[in-house]
């Protein structure tokens, strides 16, 4: 089959937002208008097309990014619906990596919320162009201009309306297009009957004022337009659209639109904006990668004639077809039944069938082209972030980096039968979700699972029960602490065993220094003159790495340390790799005495929204939990408190907040960074863990 849509007419977009801003409903409406579904599903009825896991339908939130494809005005739009709950930021991150553009959905009553900030920051990191859709304009308290202001204040975004609403709350009846300077009035509930009219008299002045701001903002991003603007010349509609498109693609400008997905208003205009302002695969830079034959950097342009290269961004188990691998094709074409190279693992894989997904229904296709997003059946070794490419043109594309988990719980199977099934279930879930880890505690033998938050682990345990029929008892959540050194020190490790016959001999001197936060472990070999033979150097590094898994104070992983091997000695007969591995681990333990080791704990950025009367209580909550208030802002009758609080102190806070505010307060938290725990807390943790120090 020939290519159905040209690259110019392809859009790969994500829908991203804070939880409950109406993201899934917006996607539903897109699918309705583009003819993909005939009946609209409502999230609050648990019938939404994009939320296809049982837990999503029950909880009314989106957990996995469902990928679907739609058509609008002769364009193909591939949409990835991403979750807004902070525990699932990993899903957002991996989606952003393979998108060309995104629609950020805001709740017009709340404007920019904490999770909006998180996903916005991630999108900026990946240089993803965005348009902003101010949703829920029909809601009580909806305020379009407050939302625009919050984009400036909280995100420092150069965001400007390209349309403004007519009315708000139940009087929200239409939208003024600031580019055409026309009004779109909605006359029926399904949003299919739209009348284009002149701008109502009482809105004309406001529309002219906002159009002037828009023209000025766009002109600032383009020299030619700036000259015309300064000379007082008229900027045409075509020039304005072209200027907005270029500035949006360059991530210098963010068009803002208004609407209500639930009331079917503004969604078609938002789809038009996706076509007009978000990039096609041709508008973005060719993806970079490393040519595995030459080890040099290379690029893969969006071109069907180029060698095939794609990135696997999600693996999931489908109840009907088994293991599905979602991938984004950057260059070349791929036919079902062909072989590809998984360059990240150095393995050959056969593509069984290729499916194009629509939420949880699927259509089998023979071929995918550059710029497409599809799912493959039959890949055995491919995991998230792997590159799949042509056998004769190997390349490794930039992968996806995933955050480390911050919370862990012990799980134990309820029966012997569950024991065997649990191992398989956990392995499958970990394959699907790289931010979920499974480990066995060597000393206690219990299985420990770790993830990004309580909800994240709840959902995974729930899936284990439903999809794999495994019943398990779950322990209380534990914090994933870390340890590090705060002072530089030198230490010796000497391992000598002489017991008749062949002995053991390993001897090293290592200098340890603190590394920057997040940089991990760095090893440097500074041996001169072969005092430690080259073949034993990897064993020294391995010995240090192994013993860092089990820290010196309370057995938590040691992080962010530089180790420089600078001296040592060896024995011609008795030295071997094992001896040097043990010597290295002895050096690390010896260093701990003088390196000022500390325990680190995850700090959470917490945002608490409460009615004003309860502000005093909330301040008390933060300080009693070792937290610090970092700022406050009023919003309507509510106060929003931003604070930094240790995760260890936040367990069960939902209940405390509910009872303190009669159920009127809400809070959100997202992991921010690791910080030293106070001395008194450190002593308690060491005591509780039986201490290694």
From Swiss-Prot:
The keyword GTP-binding applies. Keywords: Cytoplasm, Elongation factor, GTP-binding, Nucleotide-binding, Protein biosynthesis. InterPro entries: EFG_II (IPR041095), EFG_III (IPR009022), EFG_III/V (IPR035647), EFG_IV (IPR047872), EFG_V (IPR035649), EFG_V-like (IPR000640), EFTu-like_2 (IPR004161), G_TR_CS (IPR031157). PROSITE patterns: G_TR_1 (PS00301), G_TR_2 (PS51722). Signal peptide: none annotated. It is found in: Cytoplasm. One of its GO terms (molecular function) is translation elongation factor activity. Residues 8-282 form the tr-type G domain. GO terms for biological process: ribosome disassembly. GTP binds at residues 17-24, 81-85, 135-138. Belongs to the TRAFAC class translation factor GTPase superfamily. Classic translation factor GTPase family. EF-G/EF-2 subfamily. NCBIfam families: EF-G, PRK12740.1-3, PRK12740.1-5, small_GTP. Catalyzes the GTP-dependent ribosomal translocation step during translation elongation. During this step, the ribosome changes from the pre-translocational (PRE) to the post-translocational (POST) state as the newly formed A-site-bound peptidyl-tRNA and P-site-bound deacylated tRNA move to the P and E sites, respectively. Catalyzes the coordinated movement of the two tRNA molecules, the mRNA and conformational changes in the ribosome. PANTHER family: RIBOSOME-RELEASING FACTOR 2, MITOCHONDRIAL, TRANSLATION ELONGATION FACTOR G-RELATED. This is Elongation factor G.
């Amino acid at each position: 089959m020939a290519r159905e849509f040209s690259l110019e007419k392809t859009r790969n977009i994500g829908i991203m937002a804070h939880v409950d801003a109406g993201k899934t409903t917006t996607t539903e409406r897109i699918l309705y208008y583009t003819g993909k579904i005939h009946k609209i599903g409502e999230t609050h009825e648990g019938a939404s097309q994009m939320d296809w896991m049982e837990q999503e339908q029950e909880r009314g939130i989106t957990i996995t990014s469902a990928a679907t494809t739609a058509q609008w005005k002769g364009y193909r739009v591939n949409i990835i619906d991403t979750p807004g709950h902070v525990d699932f930021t990993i899903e957002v991150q991996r989606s952003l990596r393979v998108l060309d553009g995104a629609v950020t959905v805001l709740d017009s009553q709340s404007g920019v919320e904490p999770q909006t900030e998180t996903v916005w920051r991630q999108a900026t990191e990946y240089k993803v162009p965005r348009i902003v859709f101010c949703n829920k304009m029909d809601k009580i308290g909806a305020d379009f201009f407050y939302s625009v202001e919050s984009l400036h204040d909280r995100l420092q975004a150069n965001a400007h309306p390209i349309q403004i609403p007519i009315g708000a709350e139940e009087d929200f009846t239409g939208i003024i297009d600031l580019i055409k300077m026309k009004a779109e009035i909605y006359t029926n509930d399904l949003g299919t009957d739209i009348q284009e009219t002149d701008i109502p008299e009482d809105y004309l002045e406001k529309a002219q004022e906002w159009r002037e701001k828009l023209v000025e903002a766009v002109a600032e991003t383009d020299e030619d337009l700036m000259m015309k603007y300064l000379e007082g010349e008229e900027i045409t509609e075509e020039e304005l659209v072209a200027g907005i498109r270029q500035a949006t693609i360059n991530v210098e400008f963010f068009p803002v639109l208004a609407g209500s997905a639930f009331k079917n208003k503004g969604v078609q205009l938002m789809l038009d904006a996706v076509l007009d302002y978000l990039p096609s695969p041709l508008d973005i830079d060719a993806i970079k990668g490393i040519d595995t034959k030459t080890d040099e950097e290379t690029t893969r342009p969006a071109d069907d004639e180029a060698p095939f290269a794609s990135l696997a961004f999600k693996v999931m188990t489908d109840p009907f077809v088994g293991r599905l691998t979602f991938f984004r094709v950057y260059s070349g074409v791929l036919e079902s039944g062909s072989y590809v190279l998984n360059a990240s693992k150095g393995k050959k894989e056969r593509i069984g069938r290729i499916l194009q997904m629509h939420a949880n229904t699927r259509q089998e296709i023979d071929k995918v082209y550059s710029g497409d997003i599809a799912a493959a059946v039959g890949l055995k070794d491919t995991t998230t972030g792997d590159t799949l490419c042509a056998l004769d043109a190997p390349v490794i594309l930039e992968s996806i980096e995933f955050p480390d988990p911050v919370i862990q719980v012990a799980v134990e199977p309820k029966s012997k039968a569950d024991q065997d099934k649990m191992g398989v279930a956990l392995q499958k879930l970990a394959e699907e979700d790289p931010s979920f880890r499974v480990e066995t505690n060597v000393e206690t033998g219990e299985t420990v699972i770790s993830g990004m938050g309580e909800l994240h682990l709840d959902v995974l345990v729930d899936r284990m029960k439903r999809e794999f029929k495994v019943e398990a008892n779950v322990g209380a959540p534990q914090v994933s602490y870390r340890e590090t050194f705060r002072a530089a020190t030198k230490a010796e490790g000497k391992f000598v065993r002489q017991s008749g016959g062949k002995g053991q001999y390993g001897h090293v001197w290592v200098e340890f220094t603190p590394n920057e936060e997040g940089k991990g472990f760095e090893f440097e070999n500074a041996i001169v003159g072969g005092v430690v033979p080259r073949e034993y150097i990897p064993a020294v590094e391995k010995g240090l790495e192994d013993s860092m898994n089990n820290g010196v104070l309370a057995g938590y992983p040691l992080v962010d340390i530089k180790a420089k091997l600078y001296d040592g000695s060896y024995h011609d007969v008795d030295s071997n790799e094992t001896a040097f591995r043990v010597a290295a681990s002895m050096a690390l333990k010896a260093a701990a005495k003088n390196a000022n080791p500390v325990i680190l704990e995850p700090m959470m950025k917490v945002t608490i929204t409460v009615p004003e009367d309860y502000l005093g209580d909330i301040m008390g909550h933060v300080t009693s939990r070792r937290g610090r208030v970092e700022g406050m802002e009023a919003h309507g009758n509510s106060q929003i408190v931003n604070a930094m609080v240790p995760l260890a102190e936040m367990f069960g806070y939902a209940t405390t907040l509910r009872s303190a505010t009669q159920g009127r307060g809400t809070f959100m938290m997202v992991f921010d960074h690791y910080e030293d725990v106070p001395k008194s807390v450190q002593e308690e943790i060491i005591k509780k863990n039986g201490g290694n120090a």
